[in-house]
Amino acid sequence: MPAANELSATQLVAAVTSGALRVVDIAQAVIARIEARDGEVQAFAHFDKEALLRQAEALDRAPVKGPLHGVPLGIKDVFNTRDMPTAHNSPRYAGSRPGVDAAAVDTLRAAGALLVGKTVTTEFAATLRGGKTRNPHDPARTPGGSSSGSAASVADFQTTIALGTQTGGSTIRPGSFNGVYAMKPTWNSISREGFKMGTISADTVGLYARTAEDLALLADVFDLDALEGPMPVTLAGARVAICRTPVWPKAQPEVHAAMTQAEAALRAAGAVVSDLDLPEIFARFADAQARIHARETRSTFLNEYRTTPDLHEEFKARVEHRDAPAAAELREAYKLVDICRALFDDIAAAYDVILTPSATGEAPLGQDKTGDASFNSMWTLLQVPVVNVPGFHGPAGMPVGLSLVARRYEDRKVIAYAGLAGTLFAAEAGA
């Protein structure tokens, strides 16, 4: 049997329920992995092994609490936690202990999850400036961001599942760079109470796992909307659209190759594949999104601006509204986004899922920046469910993920197809 920290959530729950593993065994395996790898990966902003062992012992003494009993969970350090600090990677909140769990954390704790620690985020999850976390596949490269530590901890077997957030591409892009399943659910389908938001109309709780089956388990825990039809069990006959989006010129050769391989594999598996060119109005979406982001982050960071003398210049600029859109421009931006949301729901109804890039390429070298969110941002503000599906690799041997997208509230369908596509992509890439 693999080490406990290498098992999936589904396997761990079965092992704990049958008595084959104790939660303490799982905790000890996690501790050993973190101690062996933390010097290189640095996924955690807060980790207390003694507290983790006490928590594991308490779970072993208790009856099975729920569907995640004993499953190691990483929590992005923008979520409030009652028994760990929540610092947002900012001097403003260093040592802060809210004393209460964010709603998503509370839900996972009630389901029996083993809370390993707080994972590294970029400051306030609102900047492209890199943090201390390194990509576990190559420490010279970024793990992406802002959910840097969550993605890296899952990829490196330090956690089994993890919480992230997404304003632009903060869950999906790290999923691609680290080679794990990553999900941005339908906007607000998981409560956002108790985490620091940047853009209110976009920010979404994100999920990480190493298998699509584990994403489905998390969907159960968070009671995501049920499938409207039968569960997909094959790609044969599936209606798949290939959408390169208006930012396709940014795609690097490895993304071109992955999309080409994926399309060929889907056709060979019997899927009905067609190209999807979005209407012209979507070419104006990025500009509208930038205007909305500028205005909403001004409100988000106003309190820090007024109470924190050493707030980073990037956040000062946002609050001071130095690049502010005029009121009329802002109203037009919201109007365009509303039109695109309704239009996309109608367009996507013709397909089961839409295949699109997760990132512009492999994880870039260096730690100064966390990468480009261009292929993620539109889907985030459209508020639709997205799953990064791992499987392909670029010329440096680094992971290259692709995303599956569907209409709002079709989260479980996307997860089901992600599982089928993930198996196919891994076989196609020889993983």
What is each stretch, according to the model?
Residues 1-50, 267-270, 429-431:
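An N-terminal boundary/leader segment
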Residues 52-54, 61-130:
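Acidic/His- and Gly-rich active-site-bordering loop/insert found
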Residues 85-95, 252-253, 363-370:
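Glycine/threonine-rich flexible loop motifs
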Residues 184-263, 425-431:
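A short helix-breaking turn/cap at a secondary-structure junction
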Residues 68-88, 237-239, 291-345, 390-401:
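Short helix-loop capping/hinge segments that flank enzyme active sites or metal/cofactor-binding pockets
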Residues 100-219, 382-393, 399-401:
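Short glycine/serine-rich loop segments
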Residues 20-28, 57-60, 253-277, 302-306, ...:
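Acyltransferase
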Residues 19, 30, 70, 110, ...:
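Glycine-rich, small-residue loops and helix-cap segments
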